[in-house]
Amino acid sequence: MDLINLLFVSFWFILPAYTANAMACIFGGGKPVDLNKNFIDQKRLIGNGVTYRGTFFGVFFGIVTAIIQYLVSNLGFKFILSFNFTLIEYVIIGFLLSFGALFGDMFGSFLKRRLGFKQGQSAPVLDQITFIVFALIFVSYYYLVPSKISITLLILSPVVHILSNIIAYKLGLKKVWW
């Protein structure tokens, strides 16, 4: 597989996770998933930035993305995309990638609170990598992602994450660019 194809296939595979991450930001707000509770260190468990509404819509749109991927793959693009999943497999993988990505964000927020980072404060690497690591962990219970794709995503995702955050900031969807 050449580099361009590897980048495209990797991006195509992880797209439900990227979508979930973006839609959680766009549709977030409301009740935080930690219910304003503190951990044993008396700091918030996660913070106000991770909400039930954002999580629901993130996962929902991640699954919708997976369904669209299935439809596109059945338009004759299977030879490009390297995946031959059924509709139900796309839905399961879309759910696992989406929920895994958002769980990774929650875990990252949990770690940031323990390390003394305030909500919205940048934590380089942690902000960019936890969502992709957990998306890959969650999906691996159903589908073992080829190592080439996993490694590509671990390298590609921080760049995509930073660029998408800058775009969201410029569009007024985020308060900070990171």
From Swiss-Prot:
Provide the primary localization.
membrane
Record the organism. Answer: Methanococcus vannielii (strain ATCC 35089 / DSM 1224 / JCM 13029 / OCM 148 / SB)
* Membrane topology category: Multi-pass membrane protein
Q: Which UniProt keywords apply?
A: Cell membrane, Lipid biosynthesis, Lipid metabolism, Magnesium, Membrane, Phospholipid biosynthesis, Phospholipid metabolism, Transferase, Transmembrane, Transmembrane helix
**Membrane-crossing residues?**
7-27, 56-76, 91-111, 125-145, 149-169
Essential cofactor(s): Mg(2+)
Report the protein name in the record.
Answer: CDP-archaeol synthase
Q: Which family does it belong to?
A: Belongs to the CDP-archaeol synthase family.
